Amino acid sequence: MTDSPLPRSVRRGGVVFAAVLGGLLILAVVATVWIGVRGVLAYSHLRDAQQTAAAVRENLADPAAASDAIAALAADTGAAHAMTSDPVWNLAEGLPWVGPQLAAVATVAESLDGVTSTALRPLSEVAASFQVDALKPQDGQLHLAPLQQISGAAQTASDGVGAAAASVSSIDRTALVAPVREAVDEVDALLVEAGTATDALARATQLIPSMLGADAPRDYLVLFQNNAEWRSLGGIPGAMALIHTDGGAISLAAQESSSDYPRYDDAVLPLGDEVTAIYGERPGRWIQNVTQVPDFAVSGALAREMWARQHGGQQVDGVIALDPVALSYLLEATGPITLPTGDVLAPDNAVQLLLNDVYSRYTRPADQDAFFAMAAASVFEKLSGGEVDPAALVGALTRAGDEDRLLLWSTHENEQSVLADTTLAGGLPVSDDEAARFGVYVNDGTGSKMDFYQNATTSLEWSSCALDAAGTATGDAVLTVTIGNTAPADAASLPAYITGDSAFGVPAGITRTIGYLYLPEGFELVDATMSDGTGFGGGTHDGRRVVSFAIDLPPGGSTTATLTARASEPVAATLEAVTTPTLTPPAAVAAVCGGS
């Protein structure tokens, strides 16, 4: 054997180095296999969890079944979390390329495990004995104890889901490969959906018992908005009712018409200079105009004061508003209702009957009011008597709330704070990290019910924009609003109560619409045009630029308002528009910088 020319110490060092290198390679291979095996197992558990989550969603109307599914879900998410949180996995998260993939999977697994083990599972254990029929009134009374019992767990669940959603939302997607990125996006969307549901449940369990008189009797003024005569928040308050609650018992205490109210010489409450500059004092002088200001806290306070002036100073605890479209959703839960007149009020005819046919049938306003009161009382009797599918009722109320057709204002500060950032509050459009929001509000100026034949179409786009590293945008946004009159050519021959009979100087058959367009906070107006060549008014409302217009349309006519607004400082990349709820279900109005 030929001796190596290298010294013995060097040869020995080389052997040691080779041994160490070999050991490291072996460890790397073992670690890779370890991570791979655990990754496959974690993936399997997460896929099982996805299927189980679907079962949870399907069984929400059956809390006991949902509880079993959540227990299985917790087992899978717990296993996935365990597979992706050991020291080897954690160490590998620091590696280039593969590290971000592993870190994202670990964050998702940890977040889902946290949701199921500390949020949904405790809620499901409490709710397992909760029957959905508990939401069904019996003989005019709703038992409040079941809702009160799950309140704490509901809040814990809401907090837990919110924390998990924030964790997954913070994952940097830029370094992720497509399959991992898509999975993260899917979980992100799922947690947002779950967060919405648990937040709504937590708020409901806080609000409903107190509103139904758990602590003391309550009185609520209900405004039925008439979408055939537009106002910013839906329509003029036509029919009205007083609801009394006490210990879960619900009763219809009084019914009235807005025609019973006078025109006040001055606004019943101070409106403030900004509101008065845009709307004048009309919202504070006529109860039919309280919903002209697109802020239901203002509308509710005005209606409450007018009620008090008409009823010896009686102060209601809150004001609720809903419209006939929301009523049609409720009829899906109650089933058709036969009225004393023989008419059958059903989901597919309620809007037509209440907002158009009634004016052809009854020429005297007093008779119209009597019909509305009868219809409202019949629906209330069916709901309070428990003749309702509770799951369908929850769905109907949720849909009405999502479409801004159900609004609520409370005089109790703790309750109003719970409502404040929900659609039920009916507040001005608020921009946040998710979206910059415009407001599009339409109002009748004819003094008629011609808006039954009108439509309002809104679109948004970024005409130019730039995204920064944080994902926020600057640039120019274009808001387009088209008002169309679809009334028949002989609209002038319609009943006088529908056309307005020229009471406000608008010829019969013509519609007059006043629009108020709110820019998001921080946006400046660049340009504004009307397709008919008319001009604009406006002002500023609570930090938002407001542009107003007025148009008269013959049957078949339409006019378009186009605004260009600039965001010079970074805002959310998504644009959205909040619009007046009309007779048709609203279409989503949104635009994304750099997307569709």
Language-model-derived ranges and their functions:
Residues 1-16:
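Terminal targeting segments of Actinobacterial cell-envelope proteins
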Residues 18-34:
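Hydrophobic membrane-insertion alpha-helices, especially the h-region
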Residues 34-587, 593-596:
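Non-catalytic, solvent-exposed segments at the cell envelope interface
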